[in-house]
């Protein structure tokens, strides 16, 4: 059968676990400080949502109303070593006077946590393999217990290295949001040139990915050229401009868009009721930066 599948993707291998403190900046957006990389991440267990979903029956409908509790993701992280960043910055442990030991305090730290999963996909058009990353961000992650471990005596069969298992939970963040909505987790996928730019930025200085982070090589919308028009009748506010419902992106794809028309003062205007003047049309689509196009309306002669 000839079916139009998407590009085929696989993900494998965790790396670059970063923890950071997050505060709200003066512009309301997250600001990150005290970035540290944690060495020795082996795996991240399933972060399951513990919130209950309840259906309330009425009449002859079993789900007259449905309510979901607050999101609480719980899971675990496994490490093959526990370095200072893990002990101090996540578990809140206290270092001994001689600098050789650590003791638990129960004062677990809440951090913004990010890690990468390597990926590879085969482009559906060219057939080429493209490398990339899945970037996983938990804006508000906290341990729920001290890290546990098991050790065994060496034998003729050898012995496995000790692994530490850390129980964690993630909740909504009041600061880190997507489209104005609070989120307990976000996963980004970056490929090709964007992945290369991401790695370059990360190597020059640790950072946390955000919904508005711009990377070089992004696929963008191509702004249209909107023809100038005149009003339908002289002296009336009845101008109509041609506003496309789809735009091309920088790779030639056709993308459905929404649009908003604003006058020179930034006030939203209604197509078909446009007065003579200059207007800016803003086009939006999920996964793309907005683009704008200018157009003028003149009075009918």
From Swiss-Prot:
It is found in: Virion. Its main location: virion. It comes from the Viruses. The keyword Manganese does not apply. GO terms for cellular component: virus tail, tube. One of its GO terms (biological process) is symbiont genome ejection through host cell envelope, long flexible tail mechanism. Keywords: Viral genome ejection through host cell envelope, Viral long flexible tail ejection system, Viral penetration into host cytoplasm, Viral tail protein, Viral tail tube protein, Virion, Virus entry into host cell. Signal peptide: none annotated. Homohexamer. Interacts with the tail terminator protein. The C-terminus probably makes protruding decorations on the whole length of the tail tube. Forms the cylindrical rigid tail tube with a 4 nm wide central channel for DNA ejection. The tube is composed of 31 hexameric rings. Belongs to the skunalikevirus tail tube protein family. This is Tail tube protein.
């Amino acid at each position: 059968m000839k079916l139009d599948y998407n590009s085929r993707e696989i993900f494998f291998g965790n790396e670059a676990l970063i923890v950071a403190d997050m505060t709200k900046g003066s512009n309301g957006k997250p600001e990150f400080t005290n970035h540290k990389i944690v060495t020795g991440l082996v795996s991240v267990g399933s972060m399951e949502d513990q919130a209950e979903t309840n259906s309330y029956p009425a009449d002859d409908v079993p789900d007259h109303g449905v309510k979901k509790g607050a999101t609480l993701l719980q899971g675990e992280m496994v490490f093959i070593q526990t370095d200072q960043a893990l002990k101090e910055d996540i578990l809140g442990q206290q270092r001994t006077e001689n600098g050789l030991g650590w003791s638990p305090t129960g004062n677990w730290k809440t951090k913004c946590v990010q890690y990468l999963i390597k990926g590879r996909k085969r482009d559906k058009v060219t057939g080429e393999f493209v490398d990339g990353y899945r970037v996983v961000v938990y804006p508000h992650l906290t341990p729920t217990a001290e890290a546990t471990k098991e050790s065994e005596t060496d034998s003729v069969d050898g012995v496995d290295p000790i692994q530490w298992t850390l129980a964690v939970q993630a909740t909504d963040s009041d600061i880190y949001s997507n489209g104005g909505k609070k989120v307990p987790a976000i996963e980004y996928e970056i490929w090709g040139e964007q992945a290369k730019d991401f790695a370059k930025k990360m190597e020059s200085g640790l950072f946390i990915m955000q919904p508005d982070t711009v990377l070089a090589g992004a696929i963008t919308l191509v702004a249209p050229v909107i023809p100038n028009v005149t009003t339908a009748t002289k002296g009336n506010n009845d101008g109509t401009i041609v506003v496309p419902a789809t735009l091309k992106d920088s790779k030639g794809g056709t993308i459905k868009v929404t649009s908003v028309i604003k006058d020179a003062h930034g006030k939203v205007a209604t197509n078909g009721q446009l007065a003579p003047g200059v207007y800016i049309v803003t086009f939006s689509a999920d996964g793309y930066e907005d683009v704008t196009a200018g157009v003028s309306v003149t009075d009918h002669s």
